[in-house]
Amino acid sequence: MRGGENRPPARVQSSSEELELRHQSLDAFPGRRLPGRGIQPAAKMSSVGKVTQVPNGKAYQQIFQAEVQLVHSLAATRKRAAERSVTLKSGRIPMMKKVETPEGEVMSPRQQKWMHSLPNDWIMENPVLHREKERAKREKARESENTIAAREVRGLMDTIVPEKISTSTFQRQAEHKRKSYESALASFQEEIAQVGKEMEPLIVDTGGLFLKKLTESDEEMNRLFLKVENDTNLEDYTIQALLELWDKVAGRLLLRKQEIKELDEALHSLEFSRTDKLKSVLKKYAEVIEKTSYLMRPEVYRLINEEAMVMNYALLGNRKALAQLFVNLMESTLQQELDSRHRWQGLVDTWKALKKEALLQSFSEFMASESIHTPPAVTKELEVMLKTQNVLQQRRLKHLCTICDLLPPSYSKTQLTEWHSSLNSLNKELDTYHVDCMMRIRLLYEKTWQECLMHVQNCKKQLLDWKAFTEEEAETLVNQFFFQMVGALQGKVEEDLELLDKSFETLADQTEWQSSHLFKYFQEVVQLWEAHQSELLVQELELEKRMEQHRQKHSLESQVQEAHLDRLLDQLRQQSDKETLAFHLEKVKDYLKNMKSRYECFHTLLTKEVMEYPAIMLKELNSYSSALSQYFFVREIFEQNLAGEVIFKFRQPEAHEKPSQKRVKKLRKKQGSKEDMTRSEESISSGTSTARSVEEVEEENDQEMESFITEEVLGQQKKSPLHAKMDESKEGSIQGLEEMQVEREGSLNPSLNEENVKGQGEKKEESEEEDEKEEEEEEEKLEEEKEEKEAQEEQESLSVGEEEDKEEGLEEIYYEDMESFTISSGNTYFVFVPLEEEHCRKSHSTFSAMFINDTSSAKFIEQVTIPSRLILEIKKQLRAGFFEHLEKWFDQCSLNTRVTVATKINELDSELELHLHLHQPRAQQIEKDIHNVRAAELLLHQEQLDSHCAGVTETLKKKRLMFCQFQEEQNVRSKNFRLKIYDMEHIFLNATRSQKLVTLSNTLHQELLSYVDVTQVSLRSFRQYLEESLGKLRYSNIEFIKHCRLFSEGGNFSPKEINSLCSRLEKEAARIELVESVIMLNMEKLENEYLDQANDVINKFESKFHNLSVDLIFIEKIQRLLTNLQVKIKCQVAKSNSQTNGLNFSLQQLQNKIKTCQESRGEKTTVTTEELLSFVQTWKEKLSQRIQYLNCSLDRVSMTELVFTNTILKDQEEDSDILTSSEALEEEAKLDVVTPESFTQLSRVGKPLIEDPAVDVIRKLLQLPNTKWPTHHCDKDPSQTGRGAWACGSRGSSEAGAGGAVCSPPVLCSCPGPSSPKGFKRHRCQPENSGKKAVPSASATSAGSFTPHPKPNKMERKYRVLGDKPPPAAEDFKGIILTLLWESSENLLTVAEEFYRKEKRPVTRPDCMCDTFDQCAENISKKILEYQSQANKYHNSCLIELRIQIRRFEELLPQVCWLVMENFKEHHWKKFFTSVKEIRGQFEEQQKRLEKRKDKNAQKLHLNLGHPVHFQEMESLHLSEEERQEELDSMIRMNKEKLEECTRRNGQVFITNLATFTEKFLLQLDEVVTIDDVQVARMEPPKQKLSMLIRRKLAGLSLKEESEKPLIERGSRKWPGIKPTEVTIQNKILLQPTSSISTTKTTLGHLAAVEARDAVYLKYLASFEEELKRIQDDCTSQIKEAQRWKDSWKQSLHTIQGLYV
């Protein structure tokens, strides 16, 4: 080892590792302090334990053994001390961790585990043991060596070792130590050499494996490059493939770097393992050499230190070699990476050139594709347009043909307007469709252009996406090639679309003209029909008017006749006897015959007017037929005569029509010659392909039109019978169709030729047309002149015989120029065709159509053109339809006229018959309705007069009978009044109040007055009734006369009848006056008799009663005093109950708040800390008031109890006589008890006063010992406590007070009326005799009650049951009750003394009063003592309930503590979150500002900045961005520091506030009253069954009831403060525990407050850690984001600068 043969590889060791090695080696040899070093051994050994070698022969063996024993004893002592010391299983300090408390539990599982574990349990972590250990270490460190040594010596055993002598022991030991040292040193050298042998193969194997991997990596990279370079399809590669190639190469290079790092780490780990092995060997042999005891410990350390130094030099050399190897390998790897990058860049350049050529070729193919030149969408749209045109054209043509359905008689102006609007809408729809189609085609082409531009942009984007071309190169390539191709194609398409759009506009104008022309044509002919209809209607109205005039004249004459007849009938009705009635009846019958003859003359006149109507209608029909033939240029005029025979008249062309006819003939001849020439030229020269195609299209269109017309004609024939025989007129119409076709071909051929020249011949065509028109006009003039000359010559040369031949020639010419048509009746009509053609030509001369400009668009124009032949055919159908309707209309009108005439004649006959029928029975009706009715009226008048007189007589009899009944009623009322006065005697005797006697006395006079008033009112009312009824009877006579009206007044009486009626009614009025005077005299006599009888009864009754009021006044005073006492006691009970209810309500409200807070955790409706604390303070105030009122606190003595005790002890002997004398009364009271609860049950309405509960009290106070009265008991629960009974009384009093608004205040003490139950029954059974028997019974009772008694004195001791002096003033319940009882007792005795001091007099109410003062005072004392006993019971029950409330509040207090602490924590956390939010908001605003600067810098960065010219601009931009990045870095760092500082500051504030708040809260809880602070109530032990007691006895349990156990151990306590944790120490928010808190009490609230404080503290620390972690994470992400932007910015700058290198 020292020679270096087996030296391990050199390894460099740092100073820190060297110190660590030395320290570990020193720790392996504990003992003394090494000289010259500052290292303190782990344990110290005093000089006593030092082992030294003594020369042989100079010491006894006994001394040596003693020293050895001393050393062993000292070691054992130290071992025991070490065993007794506390050693934690884990070296870490137990931490308080944040553990969530399960819902519904107070402690977490960890805390429960601590609570259930045993003391000093090694399984559980124990902070106390750790604290004790640390304390022991600190105390031990403070002790000096001498002190330790002295303590150790004192702990040695006092043993004696026998004396022995030995001389060879030290030599043998020394030899043994030397051999052991040499063998250990040899083993040490061997193990060092073995370590070197073991490590060498591992290093060699690691290096060989690395070289193998390096070779494989080079071969793999070369293979990847060769694969791409040798591939002929390089252009098929994508940029991703090339990037993947570089990624693979880079991955290999990265893997090589990783392998180099792994090699370095593996070699270093081998060196570290070598070091560890060497350390273990050094430690091991340091102990072994030390155990041999051959060398001193310092020498052993020195030896080991030298060996370690040599090893450290070797290890440092090894580390240096490994570092150099790592640098060399990394340099070679970087060089290889640069070469590979250059090689890969060459491949990318080649790939870019290939891609550019491929992109140009693909775009050329794209532009040359069919989808661009003829887009499928446009082709499809054109096909759809053709189909839609065909559909719309068919609809329009079909609608044009429907005009034939509007012919009369089904014609209406509304239908025609609808037809025209529908046609216009169809035309507009087609025009709109053309516009929309053109728009859609343009949009489709626009999409195509957009597609081309998109393709251009895609190509550009593709170039940029490949990252092989710059943006300028891409722009140049796009502008030079792509945009030019797209622009050329777009211009060509736009020109074609413009031509098609113009053609559609021209077509729309032509269609509009055709539609308006057809509508105007039909409208003109329909106007003839409407004029004819209106004329027919006028003639019909004229007829009606003439007939109405005759009727009005006849009506006036009839009115005059009827007026004269009415006068005759009035005379007939007003006759007074039968003879005059018969004469006037005959006169009326003669006048009726004259009226009948006048009706017959009127009928003859109207019949003549009706028969002239058919001739007028026929004249109007012929006029309509003539107008129709003239409009349609028809020669024949259809007419009829009155017999219905048909007559045809022929008309000649009019003067203004002849020149037009000649002009049309010449024009037709000229057109025929031109057509022949054109056809010959076309046959010679076959024409151009364009003309042929147009002719073919025209022929196809003509064929389609012909087929369509044929279909429509057939359809019209099916619809209407008008076309049944149209086949006959086809020959004439075919010629017209052919002529129109020739004209159309002639007009189309020039336009087709001009189309080939592309519009250059348009001007030439216009000039040619003008020339032709001028030539035609000149030729027409010349021909007219020639014709005139020829005509004159012919006229001169022709003779009279030749005129007939001339007419025949003219007819032949006319037939040649005419067209015929035959209708369904077989009649044939001829039409002047030249005139009609001239009319059409003039209308069409202003329109010229030149709209076909291109062969491609010709099919779209021809598809929607309306053929002229169709218009002409529709006109012919309309003409035939009108003439068909004309013939039928003649027949229909003739028939209608005949029907109308016949109807009118029948109506006139019926009218005459009706008049005669109505006139015939008038004579009989007059005789029956007027003559006979007047006769019956005379008889009825006499009967009514007799009936009225009989009614008056009957009414007078009824009034006499009613007076008799009224007299009997007054007698009964007088009798009832007397009985009522007699019955009031019973009320006087039973009255319980003096005021009631006074009231009864006043009632007598009131009853008298009321009786007199009733009597007078009844007499007055009957007198008034009699006057009114007799007045009505008189008025009935007057009314009867008024109802008898004369004929002049609208009645049916004559003057003679009125005179007889008046004489009869005067006799009846005299009879009424006589009856009224008799009844009035009798009523005055009755009134005087009734008043005298009532006054006599009242005067006799008033003198009977006098002494009842005196006794009642005394009873009322006693009643009033007792009532006041009860009311005052009940007021105190109500006050006590209100305090109890207030405490219960507060507890319930507290429980509800707790429940609400627990259920709404996290919502806005949570209860705050201040609310809960203020609520607890309110409870404390209410509880203190309650305790003060009940005087139940243990820390003060109740003055009331002292007074009670003193009074009872003082008066116990003096009151013995009173108690002895009242034993009989107590026994009787047991049988019939009156409780205070019964006072609340007031006497109900309708029950006797004797049943009032207060009467029982008066009976007990005032009754004699031997009297027994039935009492009224209130229903109550026998188990009801004293407090419950008094509470019932208080509620009763409150209810009585509430009812005071309706009735008078309740009187709680009154006496019964009857003297005995039997008497009470007798009075009820015999009410009439009660007044007579009441006075004798009262006098009999009072006669037996006169007994002599001594004068009363209330100051005697036996009456002073509550003491002579009044109790002191008190505010508690018992003191107040005692004061009330004493004062009431004094007042009652005073009243009784005053009453019984008066002179002797009879007692009128012995059932309610006592005879002597002694009896009355004894009953008063007994009742006062009963009240006092009940008050004590009620006070005891209040104490029981108060303790229950205090206990319940203490059970709710822990929940309040937890909620308060949670709210405290949430409040602080919200404040902290607000602060953090403000800091982050400021940071975000600054960050947005810097982001805007970043965006501006990024926008400024473009490719041109890389040019050397823009170097300064580039540099300033770079500096600006670096400044912004530095500002962002500093801002992120400052934001992190601010957030962390804010978090720590808030955490420190929270802990401080939490400690302060807990201390204040615990001190406030000291003030909470517990059940231990309140007196214990006296409770009688409940009675238990004997079987239950036997079982408890057998079970060994106590037979006594267990006393109430406290909720927790009471007493003062010291609560620990908040302890610091690792988190608080690291963040320096809490380094030392807070001060402990001392309280004078220990309640559940104290425990809950401390537990809640600790839980909240842990939760806050957890949130604190999460917030710090969040701040750190946010800062890290922000730094990473900033760093990514920095790298991207640098890369962009490098790329831009590299473009111009």
UniProtKB/Swiss-Prot annotation:
UniProt KW keywords: Coiled coil
Pfam families: DUF4455, DUF4456
Stretches with biased composition (Acidic residues): 696-705, 767-808
InterPro entries: DUF4455 (IPR028089), DUF4456 (IPR027914)
Composition-biased stretches (Polar residues): 683-692
Composition bias, Basic and acidic residues: 672-682, 755-766
Region (Disordered): 1-35, 657-808, 1272-1291, 1319-1354
Sequence intervals crossing the membrane: none
GO cellular component: extracellular exosome
Comp. bias intervals (Basic residues): 661-671
Domain of life, source organism: Eukaryota
Coiled-coil regions, chain positions: 171-198, 757-804
Matches recorded under PANTHER family: COILED-COIL DOMAIN-CONTAINING PROTEIN 180
Protein name (Swiss-Prot/TrEMBL): Coiled-coil domain-containing protein 180
Organism of this sequence: Homo sapiens (Human)
Gene: CCDC180
